Curated annotation (Swiss-Prot):
Record-given protein name: Collagen alpha-4(IV) chain
Biological process per Gene Ontology, one example term: cell adhesion
Molecular functions (GO terms): extracellular matrix structural constituent
Organ and tissue specificity: Alpha 3 and alpha 4 type IV collagens are colocalized and present only in basement membranes of kidney, eye, cochlea, lung and brain.
Compositional bias segments (type: Basic and acidic residues): 174-183
Domain of life: Eukaryota
Region named Triple-helical region: 1-222
Annotated Collagen IV NC1 domain residues: 228-453
Low complexity composition bias: residue spans: 153-162
Gene: COL4A4
Family statement drawn from the similarity comment of this UniProt entry: Belongs to the type IV collagen family.
Assembly and binders: There are six type IV collagen isoforms, alpha 1(IV)-alpha 6(IV), each of which can form a triple helix structure with 2 other chains to generate type IV collagen network. The alpha 3(IV) chain forms a triple helical protomer with alpha 4(IV) and alpha 5(IV); this triple helical structure dimerizes through NC1-NC1 domain interactions such that the alpha 3(IV), alpha 4(IV) and alpha 5(IV) chains of one protomer connect with the alpha 5(IV), alpha 4(IV) and alpha 3(IV) chains of the opposite protomer, respectively. Associates with LAMB2 at the neuromuscular junction and in GBM.
Length: 453
């Protein structure tokens, strides 16, 4: 605002000195006055004045109301091609088409190989004589000698010549034997000869009728004995087999088929007493070396045992679980050697005359285990005639783990039936047998026999 009105003159105190004092200091500015009333608008400015600076931007206005919908747009361009769809399912076969028109003739084939040489034709007729040669035009030069002709056929034997005089030389060696002459006429019978020496003794005559029964002998010193032949029985169950009547039992055990050590197999004939071990073990052997050291259960050695008819397990067996799966056996003393006979058909083969039957079965031939190792049975051995057939007749025991199982790489081989009229025919037809009944019909039957004592 404008400066206020000047203040009233101050009154100086009357001093002791009658003269007036010095003028006082200027007072402080007064407070601001109230705001004045705005003045009237001034006259319009001259055009000659400078243009002012642009004002500040105004505050943004409120949003406007939505406008009306616009007109429809133009038609768009065609879109891009889509991705290839998946292949559809195969269609049904169409009907057979009409026969095609005959094709054009093929190209001429290659010439065939030359044919065989034909037989020699008959000699031709003699040709006409040629014209006489011009002796003056052709000088007579002798030609070369011709090629020797083929050897002619052998001539007939000439008549024997006259005996010539002896030659001047020394007497030669005797000549070769002449041809055999014709047989002469039989001579007249000669006089009877002298009596010959005594001939050799003739064959023994037929046995005579049995003589009368002798007197009873004295009482013996001890019990009787058999001949010492051994007979091995395998029950293919977990029960011990019974020896035939009159054959004492020597021992019982478990049916050992074969052993495998150092990746090599050692077979046991089921008809011999060594296949009946008194005590079972998944690893019944140790191996020793030249350094005087023996090792047991240090390698992946195995043992294979004849199995019982128990159902196949799903997992490996251990400890007491193994017992019902191992076949039991017995060794008996027999009066004679037992043999197996095989029919190679479905019929039971008969025992030879004066022999009696011990059991009938199926012809077990051979077996393989881990890798290409295995063994087999001699077809005359009673071990080749098992009383019961099954596709997996034995199980493998892994000695180090102490477990037994029917592994998939174990194979058994059996003698098959053969029809006599087809034994020399064409190749056998392949076949796969899955049913137990069909398998048994394909396997040869057998019988174990022993001679009557």
């Amino acid at each position: 605002g404008p400066p206020g009105p000047p203040g009233a003159p101050g009154k100086a105190l009357k001093g002791d000195i009658p003269d007036p004092g010095l003028p006082g200091d200027q007072g402080p500015p007064g407070p601001d006055g109230p705001r004045g009333v705005p003045g009237p608008p001034g006259p319009p400015g001259s055009v000659d004045l400078l243009k002012g600076e642009p004002g500040d931007c105004g505050l943004p206005g409120p949003p406007g109301l939505p406008g009306p919908p616009g007109p429809p747009g133009h038609k768009g361009f065609p879109g891009c091609d889509g991705k290839h769809g998946q292949k559809g399912p195969m269609g049904f076969p169409g009907p057979q088409g009409p026969p095609g028109s005959p094709g054009p003739p093929g190209d001429k084939g290659l010439p065939g190989p030359p044919g065989r040489r034909g037989p020699l034709g008959p000699p031709g007729s003699r040709g006409e004589p040629g014209p006489p040669a011009d002796l003056d035009a052709c000088p007579r030069i002798p030609g070369l000698p011709g090629v020797p002709g083929p050897r002619g056929p052998e001539g007939t034997m000439g008549l024997p010549g006259m005996r010539g005089p002896p030659g001047p030389g020394c007497k030669g060696e005797p000549g070769l034997d002449g041809r055999r002459g014709e047989d002469g006429l039989p001579g007249s019978p000669g006089p009877p000869g002298h009596k010959g020496d005594m001939g050799e003794a003739g064959c023994p005559g037929a046995p005579g009728p049995p003589g009368p029964m002798g007197d009873p002998g004295p009482i013996g010193f001890g019990p009787g004995y058999l001949s010492g032949f051994l007979l091995v029985l395998h029950s293919q169950t977990d029960g011990e087999p019974t020896c035939p009547m009159g054959m004492p039992r020597l021992w019982t055990g478990y049916s050992l088929l074969y052993l495998e050590g150092q990746e090599r197999a050692h077979n046991q004939d089921l008809g011999l007493a060594g296949s009946c071990l008194p005590i079972f073990s998944t690893l019944p052997f140790a191996y020793c070396n030249i350094h005087q050291v023996c090792h047991y259960a240090r390698r992946n050695d195995r043992s294979y045992w004849l199995a019982s008819t128990a159902p196949l397990p799903m997992t490996p067996l251990s400890e007491d679980e193994i017992r019902p799966y191992i076949s039991r056996c017995a060794v008996c003393e027999a009066p004679a050697q037992a043999v197996a006979v095989h029919s190679q058909d479905q019929s039971i083969p008969p025992c030879p005359r004066a022999w009696r039957s011990l059991w009938i079965g199926y012809s077990f031939l051979m077996h393989t285990g881990a890798g290409d190792q295995g063994g087999g049975q001699a077809l005359m051995s009673p071990g080749s005639c098992l009383e019961d057939f099954r596709a997996a007749p034995f199980l493998e025991c892994q000695g180090r783990q102490g477990t037994c199982h029917f592994f998939a790489n174990k194979y058994s081989f059996w003698l098959t039936t053969v029809r006599p009229d087809l034994q020399f025919s064409s190749a056998p037809l392949p076949d796969t047998l899955k049913e137990s009944h069909a398998q048994r019909q394909k396997i040869s039957r057998c019988q174990v026999c022993v001679k009557h004592s």
